[in-house]
Structures are given as C-alpha cells and as structure tokens.
Amino acid sequence: MAFQDPTYDQNKSRHINNSHLQGPNQETIEMKSKHVSFKPSRDFHTNDYSNNYIHGKSLPQQHVTNIENRVDGYPKLQKLFQAKAKQINQFATTPFGCKIGIDSIVPTLNHWIQNENLTFDVVMIGCLTENQFIYPILTQLPLDRLISKPGFLFIWANSQKINELTKLLNNEIWAKKFRRSEELVFVPIDKKSPFYPGLDQDDETLMEKMQWHCWMCITGTVRRSTDGHLIHCNVDTDLSIETKDTTNGAVPSHLYRIAENFSTATRRLHIIPARTGYETPVKVRPGWVIVSPDVMLDNFSPKRYKEEIANLGSNIPLKNEIELLRPRSPVQKAQ
C-alpha cells in the first residue's frame, strides 16, 4: 500500500500542475483590454468599389448613402438651405430665354454689351451635353466687358474639352482677366443616365471618363473674410452626384443652385453654345437669362430686364437669420 501525505489534495495538485496550460485570468484580461496599440494593422477593411464594378457592374457613386439629402443629420444646414432658397426665389427676375442660333450668340451678346450696356455678375457657359462650341465663345466674346468686376464665370464641359480649355485658362492674357479659383465635378449615377457623357460615340474604350467638370473663374478681387455681401453661402460641395429627383434636361438644377448660393448677385446669364434637341430640353429658370438654340421660351427684352433689376437690386440683401446660420471664414488673430 502506497504512502499518502495527509496534506495532499489530488484535485488541488491537478489544478496547480495544469495552471500553465490555461489562459490568463480575469485580472490579466482587464489589464490587456486597457492597452491601446497605435500600430497600423495589417488587416484592415476596405471598400473595393473597383472589384464591385468588375463583378456586379455597380459603379462607386451608387454606394454613396446621402446623395438624396446631403445635409441629412445637420439640422442647422437644412434650415440654412431652406432659408436661402426662399430668399433667392424672392429676389429673382422673370425667367428669361433668348432663342438664337449658335452662330448668332456672339453677335447678339456683343450687341447687348455695346448698345444695351448690359453686364452680368454671374455668367455660366456650357451644359451637360456633347458637341459644345465653348472655345469660340471664350476667344471671340469680350467676356471681360460682359462680366462685371468683381464677377464669377462658370465653364461646364466634359473631361476632354475641359483639358483643352485648361490650356486657354493658363494663358497669360487670359490669366490677367480671370483668376481660376475652383473646380467643380458632376457625376451621373450610371450609364443609363441622360447626363452620361459620350453616349453619341460608338467606339468602346478601355477607360471611360464619366465626369463633367467646371472651372470657376473670378474677375477682380474677392475675399471671403471681407466680401460677405458678394460671396455669401458657399456650402455646396465641389462634387455633385446625380439624384433620383434630377429632372431630364440639359442642365440639372443643382448646377444653378451652386452659383446662386455662392454669390448674392441677381444678374445671371447662362450661355449654351450647343444644340441639345427635344430629348434634353433647355428649361428657363427664375433669376436667369438663358441663351440657347433650344431654350423653351423666347421672351428676353433688355429694357424689361433692366427695369426688373432696378427694382430688385443687383445683390440679394443680407438677412439676419441667414447670417447667423451660414458658415464664415475664421477670423485671424492679431499677432
């Protein structure tokens, strides 16, 4: 019969001998949970939209969740957008359209400049359609006399044409008159969109450019910190994505809203040097004079327009409610 120590506990001995095989106790786990590692992890989560497009033909912009309501979750910005839209409609001229051929655009605008003494504070050239004759407009038209100082110029074109126009905008003579400020981008939701560029081209390329680009240029000197009566509610993002509410037409309403929110000017002109056809109509908009071969209304009168501007004023007046809500440039501290 084997001798057995009276102090020996078989279960306790098994527990002690096997302690090195068990995991850490609760106290050790709590200590490790408090430790935070700042080293980058090798395994990280990525949204591989290129892979999604290859396998499911789903474009990256279709995965953006807040394109329908860009200010969702920001009640202050929602209130600002509503108040600003209401004020813009209140101080807008009659929707004017000037229906003329492409070859008559430059002579007509020259007549307005020389004989009617018309100037505009905001001028937008181009739309979301192909075959635009933008280069002749920029080279033949005295835009420095058509646009007031300070003033704003928006030029919309596809990726190919905007690269050609960039060479012109970098020209020394042009740079003295207009200072290129920002670039805006509009992206259609998919290839079925009427705004998808290159639909009239039959050849297929490996890489397709689907964006529309806009160069925003400024005449004169404008500072955000001191010229709040000119640059007012610049809360729109530089990237715009087509929404379900975007109506069929040559110009989405969001393109107009960017210019309306950016500047308080009431004298706005839109030049569309292209035939858009009946499938993509050019609709008039309150507060704008739209010059196009296919504009749906031809009612522009320089005399009537100047009378309405005289009653409204050349700038939208400041409103306390909007002033309290709109973002401002930070005030620099005196050193």
Swiss-Prot record:
Keywords: Cytoplasm, Karyogamy, Meiosis, Nucleus. One of its GO terms (biological process) is positive regulation of transcription by RNA polymerase II. Its main location: nucleus. InterPro entries: METTL14-like, MT-A70-like. GO terms for molecular function: DNA-binding transcription factor activity; mRNA binding. One of its GO terms (cellular component) is cytosol. Residues 16-25 have a biased composition (Polar residues). It is found in: Nucleus; Cytoplasm. The keyword Membrane does not apply. PROSITE patterns: MT_A70, SAM_MTA70L_2. Residues 1-25 are annotated as: Disordered. Changing residue 260 to K: Decreases interaction with VIR1. The keyword NADP does not apply. Pfam families: MT-A70. It comes from the Eukaryota. Component of the MIS (mRNA N6-methyladenosine (m6A) methylation) complex, at least composed of IME4, KAR4, MUM2, SLZ1, and VIR1. Interacts with VIR1. Present with 1690 molecules/cell in log phase SD medium. Component of the MIS complex, a complex that mediates N6-methyladenosine (m6A) methylation of meiotic mRNAs and is required for initiation of meiosis, progression through the meiotic divisions and sporulation. May assist STE12 in the pheromone-dependent expression of KAR3 and CIK1. Belongs to the MT-A70-like family. This is Karyogamy protein KAR4. It comes from Saccharomyces cerevisiae (strain ATCC 204508 / S288c) (Baker's yeast).
